[in-house]
Amino acid sequence: MKIHVFLFVLFFFLVPIATRVKCAVKDTYSCFIMRGKCRHECHDFEKPIGFCTKLNANCYM
């Protein structure tokens, strides 16, 4: 019974956290590695990015 509870907690609580960390890593790559391609406002086909402190950018081309 304890194994079922453990798997339930693992699946429903820890998996979404891992997904958010994965997105944060992707945003960090977009902001810091592709530094010259970030801008403060989104234009036509640019993708919005998340938290970016160094550039304070919202989009990348």
Curated annotation (Swiss-Prot):
Descriptive protein name: Beta-defensin 133
Pfam families, per database record: Defensin_beta_2 (PF13841)
Subcellular location as annotated: Secreted
Biological process per Gene Ontology, one example term: innate immune response
Family named by the database record: Belongs to the beta-defensin family.
Disulfide bonds: C31-C59, C38-C52
Signal sequence extent: 1-23
Entry GO terms, CC: extracellular space
Alphabetized UniProt keyword annotations: Antibiotic, Antimicrobial, Defensin, Disulfide bond, Secreted, Signal
Lineage start: Eukaryota, Metazoa, Chordata, Craniata, Vertebrata
Protein purpose: Has antibacterial activity.
Molecular functions (GO terms): CCR6 chemokine receptor binding; chemoattractant activity
